[in-house]
Swiss-Prot record:
Any one GO cellular component localisation term in the record: cell surface
Enzyme Commission number(s) from the entry: 4.2.1.11
Protein name as it appears in the record: Enolase
Organism: Bacteroides thetaiotaomicron (strain ATCC 29148 / DSM 2079 / JCM 5827 / CCUG 10774 / NCTC 10582 / VPI-5482 / E50)
Reactions the enzyme catalyzes: (2R)-2-phosphoglycerate = phosphoenolpyruvate + H2O
GO terms of biological process kind: glycolytic process
Gene name per UniProt: eno
Length: 426
């Protein structure tokens, strides 16, 4: 079970940008392979993704430095260590880096090794990855949060909010939830086509049509849910990612950044009123980053106002980091945390954040990034931690389907023991 070889390489992600892939080979010849995702809209407190900055190569986005850090600095340190010592390996890499944001070696270097080690160890023990990470009490299949309309930084549509998601909460199983989501996705395509709108898909496989605004997007989704034969608010709920840090400046939520002259400028109080108005009008039960990552007071007020009837997910606010999550718990900000492995940069720290959240009654949403690969590790992490929710894009693009298909396999393997997540978190 000892590590014999670690090899990193530069590969391309779903956006055609370079990312890091790592192979960890054990003495027995068993290998674990992992590749690292990357985000388009990133929280300012995220762990650092090391890019080369050489404009002559991939427009400066190369990751050869991170690859070299794995091959020349991390590998010599870890070779000979037991692959079963995940915490020891992760903390050895953190010590080797020596910074809070992993800016020396790069979170993309450390994470690639961390995930590949876990995969190698699981293979060595002949266990599925979710079982190795989570132990014997892993049984909750996540409710998918499917991003079917893109706005904000993920599209050219004049809508400030970044994602409009469907949550098939009324399904009896993950398999059926996935089917419901796919049917709504195809119904939405027809709704948009009938209006002469674009059905081209964005980074995460959702549509990015030139809609009139937020309410138009929500009404289009409701029309699609009904057209697919489901009841909005019962079978399928709606979730939104406002990504409001992207349009927050000097205490003002400035919608004109994405919506042009039609967009409003709102104070924190007005932003809270607006979000409350939307959840009263539409079947929305989850809002991510409704307030800016730096507006802690706004977050507290939003949580006091609607936290009892809506899941309020902190993404940029918490960046999968226990220090920021602890602050949020203490101040009463949000009631849920988005979990992105590359925001923090190691498996151990990811699991620490999930454990802290669950211990304090916060829900967790395991999440992809907009730049993904065929690596489906987050599907296993969602089940391993009984997260109950996963956000991994729309119902198109193989980089998104890889995660959904892995969840289908896991549910099949769990058989009658599998519980579809929403029953647990409602």
């Amino acid at each position: 079970m000892k590590i014999e070889k670690i090899v990193a390489r530069e590969i391309l992600d779903s956006r055609g940008n370079p990312t890091v892939e790592v192979d960890v080979v054990l003495e027995s010849g068993i290998m674990g392979r992992a590749s690292v995702p990357s985000g388009a809209s990133t929280g300012e407190h995220e762990a650092l993704e090391l890019r080369d900055g050489d404009k002559q190569r991939y427009g400066g986005k190369g990751v050869q430095k991170a690859v070299d850090n794995v091959n020349k600095i991390i590998a010599p340190k870890l070779i000979g260590m037991s692959s079963l010592n995940q915490r020891g390996i992760d903390y050895a890499m953190l010590a080797l880096d020596g910074t809070k944001t992993k800016s020396n070696l790069g979170a993309n270097a450390i994470l690639g090794v961390s995930l590949a080690v876990a995969k190698a160890a699981a293979s060595y023990l002949d266990l599925p990855l979710y079982r190795y990470i989570g132990g014997t009490n892993t049984y909750v299949m996540p409710v998918p949060m499917m991003n079917i309309i893109n706005g904000g930084s993920h599209s050219d549509a004049p809508i400030a909010f970044q994602e409009f998601m469907i949550r098939p909460v009324g399904a009896p199983s993950f398999r059926e939830g996935l089917r419901m989501g796919a049917e709504v996705f195809h119904a939405l395509k027809k709704v948009l086509k009938d209006r002469g709108l674009s059905t081209a898909v964005g980074d995460e496989g959702g549509f990015a049509p030139n809609l009139e605004g937020t309410e138009d997007a929500l009404n289009s989704i409701i029309a699609a849910i009904k057209a697919a034969g489901y009841e909005p608010g019962k079978d399928v709920m709606i979730g939104m990612d406002c990504a409001s840090s992207e349009f927050y400046h000097d205490g003002i939520y400035d919608y004109t950044k994405f919506e042009g002259a039609k967009g409003k400028k709102r104070t924190a109080e007005e932003q809270i009123d607006y979000l409350e108005e939307l959840i009263n009008k539409f079947p929305i039960d989850s809002i991510e980053d409704g307030m800016s990552e730096n507006d802690w007071e706004g977050w507290k007020k939003l949580t006091e106002r609607i936290g009892d009837r809506c899941q309020l997910v902190g993404d940029d606010l918490f960046v999968t980091n226990v220090d920021f999550l602890a602050m949020g718990i203490e101040k009463g900000c949000a009631n849920s945390i988005l979990i992105k492995v590359n925001q923090i940069g190691s498996l151990t720290e990811t699991l620490n954040a999930i454990e802290m959240a669950h211990r304090h009654g916060y829900t967790t949403v395991t999440s992809h990034r907009s730049g993904e690969t065929e690596d489906a590790t987050i599907a296993d992490i969602a089940v391993a931690t009984n997260s109950g929710q996963i956000k991994t894009g729309s119902l198109s693009r193989s980089d998104r389907m890889a995660k959904y298909n892995q969840l289908l396999r896991i549910e099949e393997e769990l058989g009658d023991l599998a519980v579809y997540g929403y029953k647990r978190i409602k």
